[in-house]
Amino acid sequence: RIGLILFGKGNIGSRWLELFAREQTTLSARTGFEFILAGVVDSRRSLLNYEGLDASRALAFFNDEAVEQDEESLFLWMRAHPYDDLVVLDVTASEQLADQYLDFASHGFHVISANKLAGASSSSKYRQIHDAFEKTGRHWLYNATVGAGLPVNHTVRDLIDSGDTILALSGIFSGTLSWLFLQFDGTVPFTDLVDQAWQQGLTEPDPRVDLSGKDVMRKLVILAREAGYDIEPDQVRVESLVPAHCEEGSVDHFFENGEALN
C-alpha cells in the first residue's frame, strides 16, 4: 500500500486530483500497488485520513473539513503512517516545504516534486538533498519541474547515462513569457496581459518569478545539473522585466504599481 500526500491544491494540484481520480484503479491494476490518497495540504490547513480520501471530492471536503495544523503535528502524523511507503507530492512553489526535503528523506518518505526550489538551490544544498535520498534508498523525482510534464529531465539523464556529452541545451523555457510575447501587439497594456495570464494560471503564483527570469533560471540550473554540470544559480545571467519599485511587496502591490512594464 502506497500512501500519497498532496501538498498544494492550486491549478496543478486540482488538476492532479482530477487525473488521479480517473486513473487510480487503472494505476493500481497496472502496478500491483494500492495507491491511497492520505492527505491534501495547503499553506494553512490539512485534510488527512489514513483510510484514504476520495480524490474526486477531496477539494469539496477540504473546504468544509480541513483543519489548521502546525508543521510539527503534520510531520508526526506523516511519520506514524500505516503504509508500506509514503510519497510526498510537492506541487507548490514553497521554499518552506522544499527546506523539509532532508527531513522527508531521513524519515523514509519519497518525494515527487514540481517545486523547482530544491533542484535549483545552491550546489551544496542540492548535493546534500540528493545524497540524503540516495543514502536512505528513497526516490526524489522532479521531472515535472521542467517541460510541463514532458520527459525532458529523463531524456537528458538517459543521454548522460549512455555516455553522451551534452554541449548545449536550447528551447523555450518559459511558457508564460512565450504566451505574453505572442499576445502582445501594443493594443492591450502589457500589465493587463500579465493579469490575464495570472488569472488563467499560466504564471507562477507570483508572476514576478516569471517576469524576473527566476523561473527560467531555475529550469536551466536543473537541466544543467542533469547534464552533468556543477553550476550555481548565480552563474546564470538574468535580465529582469520587473520594475525596481515592484520587486518587493505583495502581488497586489505589483499589479497596482506595474505601469512601467507598459
Model features per residue range: what roles?
Residues 91, 112-114:
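Glycine-rich phosphate-binding loop of nucleotide-binding enzymes
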Residues 1-107:
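N-terminal glycine-/serine-/threonine-rich beta1-alpha1-beta2 phosphate-ribose binding loop
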Residues 183-184, 191-262:
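Substrate-binding/catalytic subdomain of NAD(P)-dependent oxidoreductase enzymes
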Residues 16-19, 49-54, 123-126, 151-157, ...:
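Short acidic, glycine/serine/threonine-rich loops at helix termini
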Residues 110, 139, 203:
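Residue-level detector of anion-binding/catalytic polar loops
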Residues 134-137, 141-200, 214, 222:
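Rossmann-like NAD(P)H-binding beta-loop-alpha module
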Residues 94-107, 116-143, 148-158:
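Rossmann-fold NAD(P)-binding glycine/threonine-rich loop
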Residues 7, 11, 15, 35, ...:
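Conserved active-site and cofactor/substrate-binding residues in soluble primary-metabolism enzymes
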